[in-house]
Amino acid sequence: MNIFDPQGPVAAADKVILIDSIAIMLAIVVPTIVAIFAFAYWFRASNPRAQYLPDFAHSGRIELVVWSIPALTIILLGGVAWIGSHQLDPAAPVAGTGSPVRIQVVSLDWKWLFIYPDQRIATVNTITVPVGAPIQFELTSSSVLNAFFIPQFGSMIYTMNGMTTQLNLQADAPGTFFGESSHYSGDGFSDMHFPVRAVPEDQFTAWVADTRKTGPTLDAAAYGQLSEQNRSMQAITYRAADPGLFTQIVTQKLPPGPGPSTGRPSLAVSPRSEN
């Protein structure tokens, strides 16, 4: 999970914003630290040249420095954040090569469901995408608030029950990358991570064809079983997926996941003795 090794245009832009922000803050922090040691050395008791001015009360020049430097820092940091947040709007399309790949994401307890509506397949806890193609994520939650994050691809986005969010990313190079939940969601939160395989276009096409040959079908009944709480779930591929399933999840026409029990996790996945 190396945010300083971006593998997509969004992550690369995020890195620039982070480095620019750190540089602006260091421009204040470093001189301040140097000044602390310089003042301590200059005003030491053994320095006869240091002037003691007990009646000193005000200096317009010092006031100008004290207020202008923090103000400029805030303006610069605010400008970087403002421009960057608008340029990297998660819903803004990413210019890539090839046809966009749509992936519908559902956060469950405690696993990730990925539906490929155009290919009519689905996976659990694993994603495969073509290198260079725009990846259009549409996200929701079947349980509590969660967050979807692939650090080397770019921005994090929240998933919420009964609504959707959008995220556009792109993989610049082939490889296997780390994806995770970055928002605490209960007892199995630490298990909500998944590999992201970025492959050339021809390999992606072959993977879709292979996935369609074997595996179960994802329909409302299968989703009902999948939405039950469980931990450390292995990756699954579905050879076929109901194209309207995601809409039914968002509009809550299907029963949502049970969610963590009131004040405590499900004993089925986290048995513990009462004190």
Model-inferred region functions:
Residues M1-I19, A40-N275:
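Non-transmembrane, membrane-proximal soluble domains of secreted or membrane proteins
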Residues L18-A45:
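Alpha-helical transmembrane segments
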